[in-house]
Each structure stands twice: as structure tokens, then as C-alpha cells.
Amino acid sequence: MARICLHAYVGGRVQGVGFRQATREEADRLELDGWVRNLDDGRVEVVWEGEEDRAKALERWLGRGPRHAEVSAVEVEQMPLQGIAGFVVRR
């Protein structure tokens, strides 16, 4: 299956609830590469790439997030592959 790269902004109660760490763990489970970070406006930004079915699985997961999160919006767009290796939480 082809690799794709996706970029998302996740809104709602997504900071201070373990969202970034949980996203990294889910991405690792799905064998995806990329990064996640908090934004000053309260959203979380995520860029990830991997096999299309796995990448789409993370997109679906972002719509729910971890247990204590309350996701109200997810904006996702496809972008060119970035050649990212590993998945990290950016500060």
C-alpha cells in the first residue's frame, strides 16, 4: 500500500489531558512517523505519514482522542511526503 502524509489541527479540550502523549503512543502502535505539538490557540497540530490504511486509522482516532479529551473539530489535509522517521512530541 502507498504511503501518504496527513496534516491535522485538532480543536476542543485537547491540551492538558495527555493528548500529545496518547497521540504518540497510537502513532507508534500504528507504525506511523511524524510529530504532534500544542498550539498557542489551544489546538493540537499533528503531521504523520505511513501506509494509507494506518494513516487513516490515526485520522479516525484523532476524532475521539484519549479518554479525558473532548474533541470538537478535526481539520485534515493531505500533503507531500516529508520523509519523517519516528514519531515525536514537539514542545
Swiss-Prot record:
EC number(s) recorded for this UniProt protein: 3.6.1.7
Matching InterPro entries:
Acylphosphatase, Acylphosphatase-like_dom, Acylphosphatase-like_dom_sf, Acylphosphatase_CS
Single annotated GO MF: acylphosphatase activity
Q: Which reaction does it catalyse?
A: an acyl phosphate + H2O = a carboxylate + phosphate + H(+)
Q: Please, which domain of life does this record's source organism belong to?
A: Bacteria
The UniProt entry annotates the active site at 20, 38
Write the record's keywords in alphabetical order, separated by commas. Hydrolase
NCBIfam families with a match to the protein in the record: PRK14442.1 (NF011014)
UniProt similarity note = Belongs to the acylphosphatase family.
Q: What is this protein identified as?
A: Acylphosphatase
Q: Name the gene.
A: acyP
